Regions:
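Substrate/cofactor-recognition hotspot
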Residues: 176
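Beta/alpha (TIM)-barrel catalytic core signal, keyed to glycine-rich beta->alpha loops juxtaposed to Asp/Glu
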Residues: 1-173, 183-185
């Protein structure tokens, strides 16, 4: 990558699913621009990387910031997904047991959304945007209405106190495993 940058063929580079050790090693060889890892209210394991990212001025690109759509709060224990075509059919957060296990999170997220005149998805994204200036969520969607909804999350203000309150709540709310991750260690 350093050779490509030196040749002017690329201007920035990043890595995905990286640990602190890998970030430090890669950054020493050729300064990183960004690290892309799974991150959401339900999967916060990579928060331990934030100090090194801040120190090294590396951006954090959060993929699956809505836990594969679960944090939209649009699903219940009766939701079904076609096993042969819809990957959510194998994700623990979308199983009937997972939805029941995550009920307190869903209820709590809906309350905050109502207080802010927002959707649960917008609160999830606004929380991320308010946490750190180097954190950029990249939610995916195939729906223009959802894209507009996600973009509007940027206009929702969460104070430092509100972010801290959300973080504290997330530490104590029981949650299921999420696809591609594991239970957040308390």
């Amino acid at each position: 990558m350093k050779e490509l940058i030196d040749q002017g063929k690329i201007t920035h580079w990043g890595i995905s699913e990286a640990t602190e050790e890998i970030i430090r090693r890669a950054h020493k060889v050729c300064p990183l621009t960004a690290v892309q890892n799974r991150y959401s209210m339900m999967y916060r394991n990579y928060e331990s990387l934030f100090p090194v990212l801040k120190e090294s001025q590396i951006g954090f690109v959060a993929f699956s910031p809505l836990a594969n759509g679960f944090l939209t709060c649009r699903y219940d224990e009766y939701s079904t997904f076609e096993k042969s075509t819809d990957y959510r059919s194998i994700m623990p957060q979308f199983s009937s047991a997972g939805i029941v296990e995550n009920q307190k999170l869903i209820e709590w997220l809906k309350i905050i959304a109502a207080e802010k005149n927002a959707t649960p998805a917008q609160i999830s994204l606004a929380w991320m945007l308010a946490k750190n200036p180097f954190l950029v969520p990249i939610p995916g969607t195939r729906n223009l209405k959802r894209l507009t909804e996600n973009i509007q999350a940027e206009s929702i203000h969460l104070s430092v106190e509100e972010v801290t309150e959300i973080d504290d709540m997330l530490e104590h709310i029981p949650m299921s495993q999420v696809f591609g991750g594991s239970i957040v260690k308390k």
